[in-house]
Structures are given as structure tokens and as C-alpha cells.
Design a protein with these regions (language model features):
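Conserved alpha-helical substructure of the radical SAM core
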Residues: 1-101, 106-110, 277-286
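N-terminal pre-core extensions flanking Radical SAM catalytic domains
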Residues: 1-41, 219-226, 239, 243, ...
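Short, P/G- and charge-enriched loop/turn segments at secondary-structure junctions
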Residues: 10-11, 175-178, 234-237
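Disulfide-bonded cysteines in secreted/extracellular proteins and peptides
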Residues: 30, 34-37, 181, 189, ...
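Short cysteine/histidine-rich metal-coordination sites, predominantly Zn2+-binding motifs
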Residues: 50-57, 261-273
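Conserved AdoMet/S-adenosylmethionine-binding subsite of the radical SAM
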Residues: 80-208
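C-terminal accessory region of radical SAM enzymes
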Residues: 148-161, 202-258
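Extracellular/mature segments of secreted proteins
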Residues: 189-193, 255-260
């Protein structure tokens, strides 16, 4: 696991904060219903981001912030009927050097050529029983090569418990979960939504999925504006050691591992209706680098990542990793 410390310095150059990635959820619903989806997509209504509004928000943000890669995701981003316009809006804003689509791939063979011509890379998440056939994967690889687009995929056999409906009243536990959260501090999954900037997608999605209302949602972020002090306020927000309000219900990187499964919409929230303490693995929560190093040895290899091509499912490496996943996943059920 990569090392991080709260307050690690961000690179600031020419008046802008730099980060590896930034994310935009162009839709919030999905064509799959994965249990414990970190974005709570199974219970969120249909919502399509407006390309013009997105361009405006990202253009203003770009004056104070820049990312190497802007991730276009959801939900399932390919459900957006105006995806070509979304991609052009993102490119026009110049908030990032490259554009990357994250998808479950089910709609990828039908993705418009205009999108292939604009996107730089595509990342596919494959789930047991709900994945593209090898023939369709091969078709997607051919389309990517024709348009000089990088394409990778991951097989997910396990998910982590992502949030708790009940949450916790233990401020020390909330702090520990926040301190060891990969999304906030290691991967820095910065998210732009409705003119607001969030430290991670979960801080925006959890209050929405739990129907807590706009006030509970937006107090986790910072509103994007063109004021002279916005960059400094953004930097202060990003490096704050204080947990966000949504961290009370979020499990960060500490959730127990569970076998991936699809659930009905009405089942999604009830299965999360347990206290935080029941849904985390104690050994995945800590405040020291040593604790993080120990946690790495517990995490099952829940995905297989390729380089610039699609690895065939018959590859013996995948079989070995799946056996390891099955063994490691069993450790997290106790």
C-alpha cells in the first residue's frame, strides 16, 4: 500500500493545485445493482449532467486546479444520452490533460464513434455473471486500437462494505477511518458535482443515497467559484485533518470484504443497516504507517489489471488469482 500522511503537500504551480485525477459522475444511476456499491447507484434516481453546466463548472475550477486525468464515470456513464457532448465539454474546459471513461462495459460495443475519437483511455470493471463475452471484449479492444485509445479491464470478485446506514457515534473511530481512507488521501478521488468540489465521491454520494437532503450533502464539499482566495480555501479543505460529516457513515478503506453480488433496489439499503463497527474489519483501521502496512497483507487481490490489452479469461494467472481471492475473502467473513 502506498504511504500517505494527512497533510501531505499538494503540488502548486502557476496558482493552481495539481492532482493525478479528478472525477465527474455524469450519471448517478446504473444498469447493474452491485451490493455495497461505493457510489450507492442502485438507489439513486436517473440524473444526467448537463454538458454546458459541466463545462462552466470545470472551466472555473481549471483556473485554480488541474488534474492529469479527468475520469468520466457514474453510475454507468454510457447511459448518458449526451455523452459525446459531455466529452467535448470536459475537453474544452482544459481542467485535465486526458479524459478517461470508467464503465462496466455492457454498453461499450455500442458507444458512439464521436466518443472514441475524444477519449484517451477506457477502464472496464467486470463482475461475475454480468460481464461482456470475450467476443465483445475483443470488439472493444479493436475499436480502441482503431482510435488509439488505451483500454484495460479488471475482474472484480469481491467488494468491500462501503457505508453504514446507522453509522457510528465513536469520534475516534470516525477519525481512524478518515485517516486511513485511500479515496481521500492515497488515490485522492476528487469529485466535481453540481458546481461543488468534494474530497471524494463517497462524501457526495452517501448523503444523497441516504436521502439526507442537500444541506447534508453539500456541507461535505466546497463550492467552486472564481474568487481570488478560492485556491487557498481549496487547498485548506483538501489537507484538513478533520473528518467530513459524511465520514460518520462511510467505511473508507476499512470495510469487510464480501463476495460480489447483485441485489434488488429495495434490498440495497437494508443490508447496510448495521452499525459501522459491524461492517469494518478492525485490522484495516489504524492511524500509523505500520497499521497501513499490515493492512496491505490482508487485502485480497480483488482485481486483475491488464496493461494495454485484454487478458483472456482462460489465462492461468486469472485462475490462480481467483483461488487466492476465494481464500482471502473467507478471512473477512469472521
Amino acid at each position: 500500500m502506498g504511504r500517505f500522511e494527512l497533510g501531505d503537500r499538494y503540488r502548486v504551480k502557476d496558482g493552481r493545485v495539481f492532482n493525478r485525477t479528478c472525477e465527474v459522475n455524469v450519471v448517478e444511476h446504473c444498469n447493474l445493482r452491485c451490493r455495497s456499491c461505493a457510489h450507492l447507484s442502485p438507489v439513486l434516481p436517473k440524473h444526467f449532467v448537463d454538458p454546458e453546466a459541466l463545462c462552466s463548472d470545470l472551466t472555473v475550477l481549471a483556473r485554480s486546479y488541474h488534474a492529469n486525468v479527468l475520469k468520466i464515470l457514474g453510475g454507468e456513464p454510457l447511459l448518458h444520452p449526451g455523452l459525446p457532448e459531455i466529452m467535448m465539454a470536459a475537453r474544452k474546459s482544459r481542467v485535465a490533460d486526458k479524459l478517461e471513461i470508467w464503465t462496466n462495459g455492457l454498453l461499450l460495443p455500442r458507444m458512439e464513434r464521436r466518443v472514441w475519437e475524444v477519449v484517451d483511455s477506457v477502464r472496464i470493471s467486470l463482475y461475475p455473471g454480468r460481464s461482456l463475452t470475450q467476443d465483445k471484449l475483443d470488439t472493444c479492444v479493436d475499436l480502441a486500437r482503431q482510435n488509439n485509445v488505451s483500454i484495460r479491464y479488471k475482474h472484480y470478485q469481491a467488494f468491500q462494505e462501503s457505508y453504514s446506514e446507522q453509522g457510528t457515534e465513536d469520534p475516534e473511530l470516525v477519525q481512524r477511518i478518515y485517516t486511513t481512507c485511500n479515496s481521500a488521501h492515497r488515490w485522492r478521488c476528487h469529485t466535481v458535482a453540481n458546481g461543488w468540489f468534494f474530497k471524494c465521491a463517497q462524501s457526495y454520494m452517501i448523503p444523497k443515497g441516504m436521502s439526507l437532503g442537500p444541506q447534508a450533502t453539500y456541507r461535505n464539499g466546497i463550492q467552486i467559484d472564481d474568487s481570488p482566495d478560492f485556491r487557498d480555501r481549496l487547498l485548506s479543505y483538501l489537507t484538513s485533518p478533520e473528518p467530513l460529516p459524511s465520514c460518520r457513515n462511510c467505511l473508507g478503506s476499512a470495510g469487510r470484504y464480501i463476495e460480489h453480488q447483485q441485489v434488488r433496489r429495495q434490498e440495497f439499503r437494508p443490508v447496510q443497516s448495521r452499525p459501522t463497527e459491524d461492517l469494518i474489519h478492525p485490522r484495516l483501521v489504524g492511524t500509523t504507517r505500520l497499521a497501513l502496512a499490515k493492512a496491505e497483507s490482508l487485502i485480497p487481490r480483488a482485481a486483475v489489471d491488464t496493461a494495454e490489452h485484454v487478458m483472456k479469461s482462460s489465462d492461468p494467472l486469472i485462475g490462480l488469482l481467483r483461488k487466492a481471492q476465494a481464500f482471502n475473502t473467507s478471512l473477512f467473513r469472521g
